């Protein structure tokens, strides 16, 4: 876990929510999952850690990407284990061709150039891939609609979180009725950035780094954008885990200079009676 300017607000949010976020096992695959009492029980959101698979070397052990140089048979076994653990039907989850943008599509539009889904109860399971970027789930408090987005610094700059809120608004969900969870990602302790990127962000989310460069508080910036768009700040849960500073549990593209695996973060809304 890394310190950042958002830690005090993050800690208060977690205290208000009850139990702090944690990594817990589903069968043999550990997932980070939100634990706030206000997160709808009918919404399944979680990010797999790197533990519980069969891949070796820099991909050990639950790499889920076929595009990073890992053995194909190992990746397919890892995906089978993840589906079995989370009870995702064969053939799922629906995925995207992620492009670090702000486009959000429906669960029936898998494979498109996009970085988020908007879903309804009973839609197929959806997932985004990450290894430092933040997976963010936004769900109506009654579980009637939800969104899952992949958000790195470009997504934070371009407002993919508020874009998801707009898409939920098209379904009649007011922002004040949305709850959110931001999964493990790169934190300010490990996210030095150059002046060009720093200029894109409010100085409130830029912290000093030992390199002398400013460092980005990515989850803090995401949470602030959601709150500014109307999501109650007390109902935004942020993972304390930093992917780069926890090599035992998380892949990190930045820490490992690109030679690493990928996590999946999943979202599913249970069918309504």
PLM segments and residue spans:
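Active-site microenvironment for binding and transforming phosphate-containing groups
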Residues: 2-273
